[in-house]
Amino acid sequence: NSPFRHLVDIFLLKLKAKKIIRAKFNLTWKTDKILNSQYHVDTPIKSKTAIFYLNTNNGKTFFKNKKSVKSVENRMVTFNSSIKHMGTTHTDTDYRLVLNINYN
C-alpha cells in the first residue's frame, strides 16, 4: 500500500490498463556528456509499455527502428513491450525522471 499508488492509478485509467506487470520510476543525474544505455525490452511478457516524462531535458528514448522521443514534461509514449528501446542521460538539468509502466 504505497502512498504513490494513487498516482499510478491515474495513468492506468488513461491507458485503460487491466493489469500492471511492473511500474517504476527511473531517475538519472546530470552527466558531462549524453550517454546511451543498452537496447532492451522491459519484460518478455506480451504487454504494452508506457513511458511518462516528468520533466523536460535533453535526454531521449531511442527505439531500435531509429525513431526517438524527446524528454518533454507531461509527454507519454506507449508501445508494444517487445520493441527494443533505450534511454539516454542528459546534460542540461540536474535530473531526469520518467515513470515506466508495463501493463496489459
Where are the model-predicted features located?
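Fe(II)/2-oxoglutarate oxygenase catalytic core
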Residues: N1-M76, S82, M86-L97, N102-N104
